From Swiss-Prot:
Organism, scientific name: Aspergillus niger (strain ATCC MYA-4892 / CBS 513.88 / FGSC A1513)
UniProt-recorded name of the protein: Putative rhamnogalacturonase D
Recorded family membership: Belongs to the glycosyl hydrolase 28 family.
Disulfide bond entries: C37-C63, C217-C234, C338-C344, C366-C375
Segment forming the signal sequence: 1-16
Residue numbers annotated as active site: D215 (proton donor)
GO cellular component: a single term: extracellular region
EC number: 3.2.1.-
Amino acid sequence: MLVTSLIALLPAIAAAQVSGTVGPRTSASAKAAEKVCNVLDYGASANSTIDIGPPLKEAFQDCQTGGLVYIPEGDYLLSSWVSLVYGSGWALQLDGIIYRDKNVTDGGNMIFIEHTSDIEIFSNNSAGAIQGYGYLFHEQDEYGPRILRLNNVTDFSVHDLILVDSPAYFLNLVESYNGEVYNMVIRGASMGGLDGIDISGANYWIHDVEVTNGDECVTVKSPSANVRVENVFCNHSGGCAMGSLGTDTNISNIEFENIYTYNSTQMYMIKSNGGNGTVTNCSFKNFIGYSNAYMLDLDTYWGDESDGDGIKYENIGFENWKGTSSNGIQRSPIRILCPDANPCTNITLTAVELWTDTGDYVKQECSSAYGEGECLRQQNGTLASYSFTTTITSVPVTAYSPTTTMPGLISTSMDTTTSIPIPTIPTSFFPGASAYSTLMANM
């Protein structure tokens, strides 16, 4: 059904780290009242027989300065990738399902949006999806195109969409501003290089999303500022992260809160090696995670080394973390490994209680890290390099809790050799928390 009512209220966010409003400046209903460009009127077919690429481009050209591009319910074949560039005040309503043509092996981006503002990409039935059939690349240890990439976009939202089996990254937000992403499911194979949501830019609110993949769940990259991420369900994923970071890093005012991570690579990892620049004023609060390889991990010796003595990490807090690692003896649940030549300062750990699924003790590792909590050293005078490992044998009382489960846990890896089914979007993404926005299908 074509949108006929106000579908997106400009959010008033109380989050401290987001500066001002995010999302489109005008509603999709207002855009639709100005003009509707239905792809069926431009030669598209809803039975997956004709390439939707050219009709989608033509529809966009007619609506790019004000209007709504409409893809009704049905199945659509995408054989030629689409670039939607320039314009402002437009929306893309995807109520059908777009399928990548299995015979097309081009890289790049299936849908690329650039140099535009005041836009909304959404599904009015909360069932709009893009199926990338990435397994046809992955079974040969290869990668293909990203599903959706936004570059230099301002005042936008992406919501009520399902992205499935991407041949590479799923949703890539590059140096964009004032963006909101919510009510989404991303589901891909258990393979590296399949990032869920990648962010760089400023003033984002990412909330109420579920990600299954083999690499980052939601990750912040440089440069980034004023980003709030909350109510995220990393369901058999790589887990949330920051990085990898290198030279000229510039990240500040980042908040992650209410993050549930199950059977993933990490609960949260900040990763760099060498490099320079700063990461400052970051908060990671209310994390629950079970059966993850890494847990709380700030590792400045990760991956290939960049030029420089190390990034300066300061004013970073971790608060109210609960859960278990798959093997807390093999990989310490708490690892804060900072550059010897540039120690971390003002790092705080508060109510961080992590245990192990395997064994009867865990390790904690800190090096050149100063602040309060666990194995951190207090800042008293000279910030000398150090390395310290301690063993914990007492089980934290709140590390296990029968009330902290989520429905639909995925315990086995998504295969890289078979097609992945299209899931549905849930209404909750963190235990006890309802989504901020009602699904479009329920409005």
